[in-house]
Amino acid sequence: MNDSTIFVLIAIALAIILIAILFTFVPVALWISAIAAGVKIGIFELVGMRLRRVVPARVVNPLIKAVKAGLDLDTSRLEGHYLAGGNVDRVVNALIAAQRANIDLSFERAAAIDLAGRDVLEAVQMSVNPKVIETPFIAGVAMDGIEVKAKARITVRANIDRLVGGAGEDTVIARVGEGIVSTIGSQNDHKKVLENPDMISQTVLSKGLDSGTAFEILSIDIADIDIGKNIGAELQTDQAQADKNIAQAKAEERRAMAVAKEQEMKARVEEMRAKVVEAEAEVPMALSEALRQGHMGVMDYMNYQNVMADTDMRDSISKASGTKEEQHSKNDPRNRNVDK
């Protein structure tokens, strides 16, 4: 093999390597597609995107769609939105949909909505085709104590001007629920709510609940209404039970105080008895002292003994007669019938 042949082979190899590098760093196929679609973009501009770590297809393909749709966009704005973390394809689709629906939406507004975390394409579609939000059953209590449950369907349309910074669906549902509860609670009779459910939707809709939200409420319709519990009766029952428990506690307290008082009186009786016994024990000593000092004679002492004997006899007789009367009363048939 001569030197000229080796040189040719080396040249071919270098050419292949250069072509591979060119097709790796320069999306030639994408550039050809853009040129064919009428998009003016230079091949070195695509190389610059590669160097800036931008996927050229993420910018060029949406640009092709925008040009075909008649939108006035350029690569610099699309590339800037991509570098900011936005979804270029979704923004372009939203702009195309807005143009077709005659909605005034600029690229800057669409990019801001996209960067705010909102789905700008869904917002445009919702502006054309309103969305229906269905709430769960919301319970309210009328003034007569009856619980009324209502489910509402909220028809909303996206307000593109308030998508950035506006509240979402949860806020709309919460506000509508608050309005339903307030409307039901202001009625004297729950039957009025059942007879005219449209009253709820009219009252809630007139409150301007969509202020500060990203939506415009078009209508509020009551989809279902039902009767719940008798909250008033349950509250009265609970109150009666609480009053009963309080009364029982107070009665138990009084009973405990009465028992304590009774025990105290028994203790005092025993104390008095002990004093009586103590005093009786001092009587013989006093008698002996009186006899010793001559204050009492023998006859006086004998009279005292007779009086004590008579007293003991009377006590024995009275106790015996009381026992017999009690036994006779128990054995009387008339008393038995009364007991029965």
Swiss-Prot record:
Its main location: membrane. InterPro entries: FloA (IPR022853). It is found in: Cell membrane; Membrane raft. It is a single-pass membrane protein. Residues 314-340 are annotated as: Disordered. It comes from the Bacteria. One of its GO terms (cellular component) is plasma membrane. Keywords: Cell membrane, Membrane, Transmembrane, Transmembrane helix. The chain crosses the membrane at residues 6-26. Homooligomerizes. Belongs to the flotillin-like FloA family. Found in functional membrane microdomains (FMM) that may be equivalent to eukaryotic membrane rafts. FMMs are highly dynamic and increase in number as cells age. Flotillins are thought to be important factors in membrane fluidity. This is Flotillin-like protein FloA. It comes from Shouchella clausii (strain KSM-K16).
